[in-house]
Amino acid sequence: MKVAVLGAAGGIGQALALLLKTQLPAGSKLSLYDIAPVTPGVAVDLSHIPTAVEVKGFAGEDPTPALEGADVVLISAGVARKPGMDRSDLFNINAGIVRNLVEKCAAACPKALIGIITNPVNTTVAIAAEVLKAAGVYDKNRLFGVTTLDVIRSETFIAEAKGLNVDDVKINVIGGHSGVTILPLLSQVQGVSFSDEEVAALTTRIQNAGTEVVEAKAGGGSATLSMGQAACRFGLSLVRGLQGEENVIECAYVDGGSEHADFFAQPILLGKNGVESVLAYGEVSEFEANARDAMLDTLKADIKLGVEFVK
């Protein structure tokens, strides 16, 4: 199994690469690419960790050598948020980066599963889809927006608020991956109930958690370590699905035939072809139904921005 990380010298990329080096199945290959000249050195550094995962690093303008033969590609390249920015402010820089990298994926590894981490995910996934369509290799079951950070934050914050073991908390987070488009389905969490006030406060905290980190780092970065963990969890789930493991389920932002929008985050069953099936996200509360309906104009506008960027 070969996993490529594009943007591997960045804050998310290095954290993700470290976690993959220690957690990928024995015999896997880990390929690191970044435009930054330090990238081969990151690979050398990681290669000293005693796990049966082979690491190679590639720098420069062309990621093709890193992509050849990749089964999974995780794209975290781009600029990070700074105080005062929201994820959509990143669009002007990151849109072009994602377009260029996905063009290379289309040529070098057209069958790979591609996970987009680069923000704004609501838009960059739509860009990736249009690039793959233009190249004639688009398969909606092989493209994912990685929204796992919203899930792990929800798990953490719920466990903290209710004094639970975080391993026991399971939650679906639907919609998109910025602001009001992030919707944790708190009404579905087993064995716990929330007051209306708790639901409103927790939902807002989960939606604004990225900003919480950006402000806490005081201009020194955004959520890199927790995002690295989230991306590793999702990447490992992709690998487990490819290897034939059953019942591998994650939430992700996909072109899944949703009634709500062309791309929508919801639970998916992963397998040898990427998305084996898109799962129903179940019954929602009145609060959740209203929040879902209220987000759709924002989500659709984000998607349209990505489609028009490529066209």
Curated annotation (Swiss-Prot):
Keywords: NAD, Oxidoreductase, Tricarboxylic acid cycle
GO molecular function terms listed in the Swiss-Prot or TrEMBL record: L-malate dehydrogenase (NAD+) activity
First-tier enzyme category under EC: oxidoreductase
Binding site for substrate: 81, 87, 119, 153
Binding site for NAD(+): 7-13, 34, 94, 117-119, 227
Matching SUPFAM superfamilies: LDH C-terminal domain-like, NAD(P)-binding Rossmann-fold domains
Superkingdom, natural source: Bacteria
Pfam family for this entry, one: Ldh_1_N
EC number(s) given by UniProt: 1.1.1.37
InterPro entries: L-lactate/malate_DH (IPR001557), Lactate/malate_DH_C (IPR022383), Lactate/malate_DH_N (IPR001236), Lactate_DH/Glyco_Ohase_4_C (IPR015955), Malate_DH_AS (IPR001252), Malate_DH_type1 (IPR010097), Malate_DH_type1_bac (IPR023958), NAD(P)-bd_dom_sf (IPR036291)
UniProt record, GO biological process: malate metabolic process; tricarboxylic acid cycle
Residue numbers annotated as active site: 177 (proton acceptor)
Catalysed reaction, written as an equation: (S)-malate + NAD(+) = oxaloacetate + NADH + H(+)
UniProt GO cellular component terms: cytoplasm
Protein's job: Catalyzes the reversible oxidation of malate to oxaloacetate.
Family (UniProt): Belongs to the LDH/MDH superfamily. MDH type 1 family.
Assembly with partners or alone: Homodimer.
Entry-linked HAMAP family: Malate_dehydrog_1 (MF_01516)
Protein name in UniProt: Malate dehydrogenase
Organism the protein comes from: Shewanella sediminis (strain HAW-EB3)
